[in-house]
């Protein structure tokens, strides 16, 4: 016997849990799921969180790295303050903004770069995928600037034209690359999360 699952109801459980736990967003559960599987975050780490607003990932990260670590969160939109999180509002493709990030991490390298950046979707899949890949390239370029050798990178990407090439680029730069689809993601969504570990450290532009 087959049981039909009400997808909307299922997804709403994450929104309800987020509300009950007073979390910024249900994206918190996506990062939690991936982190439990891939063990990305540890106490004392330096982390850069791209596309951080409204703060779901940042609030999860600060709990994992504790006050011994450093997290710099970035978004083009404003974000309400989170204790222990250094927030910068600006465009990650702007060189002056990258210099601000460099100052916040005190010219050190991060052990983890996270990107939950997402484009303003149009409903036209080819356009939305193209925009997502573009944001993914910006995030990957930031890895080449800020990520320490052996570091990890987690990025949200829409599957479609250009995805395979992006995945290939990651495999050239990291020793371990895996594609994840957290249960809290909508099953019909094109979004996936790529976990890349053990950065080879190459200063290049993708």
Swiss-Prot record:
Gene Ontology CC annotations of this record: cytoplasm
EC number: 2.1.1.166
Database matches in InterPro entries: RNA_methyltr_RlmE, RNA_MeTrfase_FtsJ_dom, rRNA-MeTfrase_E, SAM-dependent_MTases_sf
Class of the enzyme per the UniProt entry, highest EC level: transferase
Active site feature: 156
Subcellular localization(s) per the UniProt record: Cytoplasm
Pfam families per UniProt: FtsJ
Record keywords: Cytoplasm, Methyltransferase, rRNA processing, S-adenosyl-L-methionine, Transferase
Chief localisation class: cytoplasm
Binding residues for S-adenosyl-L-methionine: 55, 57, 75, 91, 116
Annotated GO MF terms: rRNA (uridine-2'-O-)-methyltransferase activity
Catalytic reaction equation(s): uridine(2552) in 23S rRNA + S-adenosyl-L-methionine = 2'-O-methyluridine(2552) in 23S rRNA + S-adenosyl-L-homocysteine + H(+)
Domain of life: Bacteria
Family the UniProt entry places it in: Belongs to the class I-like SAM-binding methyltransferase superfamily. RNA methyltransferase RlmE family.
Role: Specifically methylates the uridine in position 2552 of 23S rRNA at the 2'-O position of the ribose in the fully assembled 50S ribosomal subunit.
Protein name: Ribosomal RNA large subunit methyltransferase E
């Amino acid at each position: 016997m087959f049981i039909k699952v009400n997808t909307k109801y299922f997804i709403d459980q994450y929104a309800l849990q987020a509300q009950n736990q007073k979390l910024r967003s249900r994206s918190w559960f996506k990062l939690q799921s991936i982190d439990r599987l891939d063990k990305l975050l540890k106490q004392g780490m330096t982390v850069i969180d791209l596309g951080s607003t409204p703060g779901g990932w940042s609030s999860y990260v600060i709990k994992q790295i504790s006050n011994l670590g450093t997290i710099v969160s970035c978004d083009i939109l404003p974000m309400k303050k989170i204790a222990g999180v250094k927030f910068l509002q600006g465009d990650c493709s702007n060189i002056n903004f990258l210099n601000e990030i460099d100052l916040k991490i005190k010219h050190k390298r991060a052990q983890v770069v996270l990107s939950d950046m997402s484009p303003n979707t149009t409903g036209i899949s080819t356009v939305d995928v193209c925009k997502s890949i573009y944001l993914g390239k910006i995030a990957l370029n930031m890895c080449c600037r800020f990520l320490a050798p052996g570091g990890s990178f987690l990025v949200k990407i829409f599957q479609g034209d250009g995805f395979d090439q992006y995945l290939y680029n990651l495999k050239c730069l990291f020793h371990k690359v895996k594609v994840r689809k957290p249960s809290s993601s909508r099953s019909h969504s094109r979004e996936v999360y790529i976990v890349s570990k053990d950065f080879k450290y190459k200063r290049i532009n993708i």
